[in-house]
A protein has these predicted regions:
Chain A
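Conserved N-terminal subdomain of the carbohydrate kinase-like
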Residues: 11-23, 40-123, 137-142, 295-325
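Extreme N-terminal starter segment of soluble prokaryotic enzymes
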Residues: 1-4
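Alpha-helix C-terminal capping segments
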Residues: 34-44, 252-254
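Conserved phosphate-binding/catalytic region of the ribokinase-like
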Residues: 189-325
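Conserved phosphate/ATP/ADP-binding segment of small-molecule kinases
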Residues: 137-145, 152-226
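Short beta-strand scaffold segments in enzyme catalytic cores
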Residues: 34, 83-87, 215-219
Length: 325, 325
């Protein structure tokens, strides 16, 4: 199954309470494609984005090693790659942005190469909703699933565009604060259902609300699935965790001909696994060379920490008197 | 199995964005015992607390109807019952305390009646840690399990007392903010393990961190269990939800001769069920007359929303090459 990933390719300078890394590899498309590569064949993954001539050599080598098709990545002569610098606070849940230099990303107009205009799965990383819509309009064939991300900046600044994009999308991945901002309701359950109503009506409507250390909620048609977080003792660098989640999720889905609830639930759990690994080293370091053993081990751990047995005293018949359970 | 509940018995005036209730029944011991009564026989539940002559007649009738032994509830002649008034904000997660009149609770010295000094299970609701310790010292026989609650007020104002109490306790129920305050670490996983170290060393060490809408984390010896929250669309009145959780949890445990991990996991889920019902009406109204059917239905729903199937392509042997999962 082919997978097209559209998003940012960036250079990040990251400071945490423990360490600092200058000009590391970053960007939503980077994390998404790397995380997806554990499930999809590298050669089935196409990237669309823009970089400057300073995009790190090791990143090109990494993409090449994975077999990604980077023909959709525009390299701007004399241009500089999108640069972000941020500093995480002690609790790792909040961060200050120190620098955002859009550089070549400021004029990004995604051009999907002809050979990528009919992917099975389309992932729209967090870019302007109008650009996400533009990419959808470049599709020659309707993908099995279009999944997108967004952020506060677009919810408050480009809501009309965002609503138009969501109406063409089958799955939305969003964090809890963004969900509440977009729906304007305190209950995440209500938010999830209202967000589903914003999506394309001609397919399953899938909403995934990421809650960081509290796991994720999946809304799939009328079903709700509550996924646990992987119980990490320490977070080294949370940059890209949300994108790794999305990549693990969509990567896993590309293994399947059809979208089914049981499969999407597992995909959310694999997304959780990739996000957990992402946090354990700087930048993309932890998700560059995982083994499937490492991934499956955490999948099983998540199953173990969230499962409980049914009531042994119960039979099919429900007793209604207290004391007879 | 006998259960002794020590805590506050109160009268609450509660205002939410939707409605208001004057002088409703409240108090930690009230919610705990009512929630526990669905699993334990009423006559096995003893209450220790203090009230004034104004304690509502319908509360006495309710306790009597459940069969609770209230011989440990002191009625102070001419005294007034602990009174709390609060107002919830729009998001229902935050509230302002408008009035706290300790009244007879100010001089509360728990006196455990002789017949209750060897309960199988002892629950210490949120009162001063020195009083919790005093109750433990009144025990003639070591209970199978001593479980306690606490709050910010004691963590900051009576930490030494609290640590002495915890060292005699087998299980602690605490919310996420309190856990971080007591341990001073941002990771709840680290907090859970550090809190376990504070508990009595001669038994299972059980810590339950309540995360409200995000569910709960159970730390049981070296195991972690992540329990989902019940997906409520609307919260009517969250007062007493934490105590109802504790009551459902301990009530369920009294059905068992021994403390086992699988049982404690289910107990956490039943606690979640009782807390979810508690939020659906004012005060104790929703947990006064539940059927076991209603309780078990939500237990099964929680099992359904949190379960996912193992990877169908996997066998016992872990493949380590990507693409062969």
């Amino acid at each position: 199954m082919s997978l097209l990933v559209v998003g940012s390719l960036a250079v990040d300078t990251i400071e945490t309470p423990f360490d600092k890394r200058e000009r590391a590899l970053g960007g939503s498309a980077t994390y998404i494609s790397l995380a997806a590569s554990y499930f999809a064949h590298g050669s089935d993954i196409g990237l669309v984005g823009v970089v400057g001539e300073d995009f790190p050599e090791h990143a090109w080598k990494l993409f090449q090693g994975k077999g990604f098709d980077t023909s959709g990545v525009e390299v701007i002569k004399g241009g500089k790659t999108f640069f972000w610098a941020g500093k995480y606070h002690y609790d790792m849940n909040t961060r200050d942005t120190l620098t955002t230099d859009l550089n070549v990303f400021a004029d990004f107009k995604p051009k999907v190469p002809a050979k990528h205009t009919s992917p099975d799965y389309l992932v729209l990383g967090n870019i302007a909703p109008s650009l996400q819509l533009d990419v959808i309009n470049q599709m020659k064939k309707k993908p099995k699933l279009i999944i997108c991300d967004t952020m506060n900046f677009w919810i408050t600044g480009a809501k009309d565009d965002l609503m138009k994009t969501l109406a063409k999308v089958n799955a939305l991945v969003i964090n809890d604060g963004e969900a509440r901002l977009l729906v304007d309701h305190p209950s995440l359950v209500v938010c999830g259902h209202k967000l589903q109503e914003m999506l394309a009506p001609d397919n399953h409507r899938i909403v995934i609300i990421k809650k960081g250390e509290h796991g994720a909620l999946l809304f799939y048609d009328q079903f709700i699935f509550s996924a646990p977080a992987y119980p990490l003792e320490e977070i080294f660098d949370p940059t890209g965790a949300g994108d790794s989640f999305m990549g693990g999720l969509i990567g896993y889905l590309t293994r399947w001909e059809t979208i089914q609830y049981a499969t999407v639930k597992r995909a959310v759990v694999y997304g959780t696994v990739l996000a957990s690994y992402c946090c354990s080293k700087f930048s993309t370091e932890a998700i560059e060379n995982l083994s499937m053993d490492q991934i499956y081990r955490r999948f099983r751990e998540l199953q173990s920490i969230s499962s409980f047995e049914d009531e042994p005293f119960r039979t099919q018949k429900h007793d209604s008197a207290a004391g007879t359970m």
